[in-house]
Amino acid sequence: TEPEQLGPRRVTIKRAGQVGVVMLGYKVAEGRHEDWAALTLLQQILGADKTGRLYRALEDKGKANSTFTFAPQLHDPSLFIFGAYLTPEATHEEAEAIILKEIETLVSGGIDLDELARAKSVIQAGTFYGRDGPYGIADQINENIAMGDWSAYVNLPKSIQAVSADALKEV
């Protein structure tokens, strides 16, 4: 195992090219942890195309060509990653500050019930469409087995629906 991290780690890579990228990663629990339903909703609320908070804060304002969140639900602890591919006009520092502000706004201001309901609906639909056919079902069950809990395949829809707006602030 890796030694305990005692402080933030920052990596800066400078290469020739026009596309700047900013990514921030925060440690999250292993995939079997009870927080994963809330983390899945946060991925949707912050990282969704067109409706996500990062999209509205960066892409709508011409600061990024693309924004994303990525949090793999793994057997071991992993990272919740927030990112943006920048436009030539945007600076890395500016994009990082905007991402951090959106995270802080979510923590301090919370999530309105309409935004939460929309995120739950999108995830629910994606879950059920992903289970359309034997390949999709086998793929999802295998992912959950690899994560360490096959029953998460069955329980995810109920877990997502049970998450409250307050629970999202605590994760």
Give a label for each model feature.
Residues 107, 151-154:
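C-terminal soluble interaction/assembly domains
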Residues 100-111:
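A common structural junction motif
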Residues 35-37:
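Zinc-dependent metallopeptidase catalytic helix centered on the HExxH motif
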Residues 1-33, 44-93, 114-125, 132, ...:
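Non-catalytic beta-strand/loop surface segments
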Residues 77, 148-152:
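Acidic/histidine-rich, surface-exposed loop or edge segments in extracytoplasmic proteins
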Residues 142-149, 160:
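C-terminal, helix-dominated tail/subdomain
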Residues 95-99:
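Hydrophobic alpha-helical membrane-association signature
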